[in-house]
Amino acid sequence: MIQAAGIYLTETDKMNITAADFGLNQIKTEGVQILTLFDTDRMAAKILVLLPYQTEPEHWHPPVGNDPGKEEVIRGIWGDLTFYIPGEDNMKEGFIVEGKEKCYTMRHEIAIGPGDQLILPPGTKHWFQAGKRGAVMYSFSTKVTDLLDQFTDPNIIRETKIEE
């Protein structure tokens, strides 16, 4: 999908794409594919990919020490993408993952097309979902602290745990 969106990938890039299922074991429904372009002590850039109708679960980036939390700018590249943030419930395009009504509380819908941007201040609850074609987007942010993200769904595990 990334290459179909017109972004050149090196062989190393292809090897570095990761998939996050958040410990839910239903990646086609809830998850995201991630290519980290760079991640320094101050800023980061990623390409995020959602498969058709895939949803990244509701979360927010909390304060860490004296840092107010990750600030993020999303820029649509390709596909059908909808973000859900605080605000009036105007949800009509997307859907709540079956049985997860309490885990997706943000219902203010914003469609993000190619070239559209959305700025998410630190601590902003959000989730996003692809439509029938899937979606590709850039995520530009301040320092990445993703392992500290908070999720509305109590069953989410952000870090993979290996059981013996």
Please tell me what each predicted stretch does:
Residues 29, 47-68, 87-89, 111-114, ...:
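Conserved short histidine dyad/triad with adjacent acidic residue
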Residues 57-58, 66, 83-84, 110, ...:
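Short beta-strand His + acidic residue motifs that chelate non-heme Fe in jelly-roll/DSBH
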Residues 1-47, 64, 98-102, 164:
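A short, N-terminal "cap"/entry segment at the start of jelly-roll beta-barrel domains
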Residues 47, 73, 127:
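Short, surface-exposed charged micro-motifs
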Residues 41-43, 52-56, 80:
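Short, charged/polar surface micro-motifs in flexible loops or helix N-caps
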Residues 44, 70, 98, 106-107, ...:
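Short, solvent-exposed loop/turn positions at domain surfaces
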